[in-house]
Design a protein with these regions (language model features):
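Bacterial N-terminal signal peptides
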Residues: 2-13
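A well-ordered secondary-structure block
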Residues: 84-162
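Short, well-ordered surface patches within globular domains
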Residues: 20-88, 137-143
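Asparagine-centered strand-capping/turn motif at beta-strand->loop junctions
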Residues: 169-180
Length: 245
């Protein structure tokens, strides 16, 4: 089932006083996006996460939304009346997971390229919800864009994380026994009748916990893509085994 995590916004402002004395110019917004990507991956590596890779369709969704906020000076995850999931889908990205960070920054003295990239990245990193998105272990793709309002000079940044639907985990739970069984998958309970099979598709790592009839302790496993777990009765006892798919 596709997952859309809770989306959090960050608004950061720099007062003229704190900007005094710094070198300013017109930031290269394409370079800012590249630097934010590099710094995001550095932070992920520092926390033991795999780096994410730029995805053209996520980049397109980020550019479109950043440009909209810059044109309208409307700010928020649904500023255009749509969700991040709807925007990435419109660009042809079929997602299993999609997460979004946004930021709004302004300084009357402007920003340099390096400074703007640093403020965007650190602003997200210092916010628990945004940092959680940046460190999500199961996203693989990223899209980043920054746009500036011609009216107010405000910069709007969008960072999208995604995992394609094609990378979902698919596995089966089979009950070859003559009795119904109960099991939990990531905390959700299921009942499986005798001699029946159920297929599951998950976007995140799954934990399967099976309660076997007559056994006091449940059995927990982490299914991989293509796995088949089968409950069978051997003599008077029930057992769970990983069967050939």
């Amino acid at each position: 089932m596709p997952i859309l995590a809770t989306l959090l916004a960050l608004a950061a402002a720099v007062s003229p006083a704190t900007a005094q004395g710094r070198a300013r110019g017109s930031p290269d917004l394409g370079e800012v996006a590249r630097l934010v990507l590099d710094r995001t991956n550095d932070l992920r590596r520092g926390e033991g996460r795999e780096p994410v890779e730029s995805a053209s369709r996520l980049d397109a969704a980020a550019r479109s939304f950043a440009a909209y906020m810059a044109r309208s000076d409307r700010y928020g995850h649904e500023a255009d009346g749509r969700t991040a999931a709807q925007r990435v889908k419109e660009q042809g990205y079929t997602y299993c997971i999609v997460l979004e960070n946004i930021a709004s920054l302004y300084s009357s003295s402007g920003f340099g390229t390096q400074e703007l990239a640093s403020k965007v990245t650190q602003g997200w990193w210092q916010s628990e919800g945004h940092r959680r998105n940046m460190l999500d272990a199961e996203v693989t793709d990223i899209g980043i864009a920054i746009a500036q309002s011609g009216k107010t000079g405000t910069y709007y940044a969008v960072q999208l994380f995604g995992r394609p639907y094609r990378t979902r985990i698919e596995f089966r739970v089979a009950n070859a026994s003559p009795a119904p069984i109960e099991y939990d998958l990531n905390g959700k309970g299921y009942s499986l009748p005798a001699h029946s099979t159920r297929m599951h598709q998950e976007c995140r790592a799954a934990r399967l916990t099976v309660r076997l009839p007559g056994e006091r302790q449940p059995i927990s496993v982490k299914p991989a893509d293509g796995d088949r777990y089968e409950v069978e009765r051997v003599g008077s006892r029930f057992q769970l085994r990983r069967a050939a798919s």
